[in-house]
Every structure is written in structure tokens, then in C-alpha cells.
Amino acid sequence: MAVLRVLCGLLLVSILFLGFVLSEGNGPKVTEKVFFDIEVDEQPLGRIIIGLFGKTVPKTVENFKQLSIGTTLKDGRTAAYKGSTFHRVIKSFMIQGGDFTNHDGTGGFSIYGERFPDENFKLKHVGAGWLSMANAGPNTNGAQFFITTTQNPWLDGKHVVFGKVVEGMSVVRQIENMQTDSRDRPVKSVKIANCGHIPVDVPFSVSNTDAAE
């Protein structure tokens, strides 16, 4: 009887451990990371670190990575997120940035040219903290992106998901809760003061859930 109780206990522990492993790493694999150091009206707010899914959407990830590093295109134009702003914020929806030319949602361009096609829609907007491309319709990806602050299934199949916040979701929440005007623009300037690439030595999977707060 005692042996049976021990075996049942071990089985329960195994089931719980398996459930933990699956919940922690049953989603897409992070192959690259980038960081954004955020300032609000020139005052430091904090750092957001985003994991990028280079195996699932390599072209989209490369565009975002190069814009985070900062690059000069063949035509001589500089393309970089550094100094750009989060120009659109909607509570319980998302925060949007990436327009490094006009800073109002009308500009920005990709490393491949003005626009590039939707790579695929394999990944979904399953929760808060997921990174997706903003667009003006099918196959109009440029530089603009958004970070979700809740689950947004109606965006699936329309916007390319390619990353997830792995650190600094509290910074995203602070931006989400900032005062905005009638056009959803933050009243205070929310700027990417610095940004760059963080190498990932060993790719790792993330869970298909909200980013950790």
C-alpha cells in the first residue's frame, strides 16, 4: 500500500512538471532579442526586451533587428528606430511605434524598400506583450509595429506576429496607461532613446500566453 502511495505521488509530480514545461515553452522559438530604452519627456522610464522568432518569420525579424541596430540602405537613407516614438496608444489594445521619419504613423520604411509582403500568419495575437507588424492593408509592411496589451484574435491573418516581450512588460503597461489626445497620441513624448541587438546563444521557446508582468 505504501509503495502504491509513493508511485501515485511520483505520477502526480510528473504530471505537474510536464504541465509546467508545456506551459512555459510550447510556443515559438526566440532566436534573437532586441532592447528598447524608453524615455518619457526626456526622463528614463525603463527597458523593454523583445524576443524575436527568427525561425518562423526570418525576413520580418531581420527587418526589425536591423532597424533596432540602425542601418544605412543602398540608397543612402538611414533606417533606425533610435529616436523614434510610440505615436499611438490605445488602452486594452496596443501601443504602436516605428515611424522613424514622420513620428506620426504616416512614415517609416523597411530595409527591403518602402514596403515588403506579409511573410506568413503562422503566429497569432494570443495575449498581451506580443509584437506584430502594423500595416495599411495586405503586403504593406514597412517599419511600424505594435505591442499588444491584451488578446486580439481579430488581427490574426491580417498582421504578422514575430516577437514577444520577454522583459519589461511593466514598461509597456506604463505606456499603455499614459494620457492620450483625441487621435490616440500620447500627450507626453514616449521615445525610444536607445535600442539594439542582444545575441541569443541558445534559442528558447516561449509560452502562448500573456507576457510576464
Swiss-Prot record:
Q: Which GO terms describe its molecular function?
A: cyclosporin A binding; peptidyl-prolyl cis-trans isomerase activity
A Pfam family hit? Pro_isomerase
Q: Which InterPro entries match?
A: Cyclophilin-like_dom_sf, Cyclophilin-type_PPIase_CS, Cyclophilin-type_PPIase_dom
Q: What is its EC number?
A: 5.2.1.8
Q: What coarse category fits the chief subcellular location reported for this protein? A: endoplasmic reticulum
The first-level EC class reads isomerase
Domain (PPIase cyclophilin-type): residue spans on this chain: 35-197
Task: State the PANTHER family in the record.
Answer: PEPTIDYL-PROLYL CIS-TRANS ISOMERASE, PEPTIDYL-PROLYL CIS-TRANS ISOMERASE D-RELATED
Q: What is this protein called?
A: Peptidyl-prolyl cis-trans isomerase B
Q: Which organism does this record belong to?
A: Schistosoma japonicum (Blood fluke)
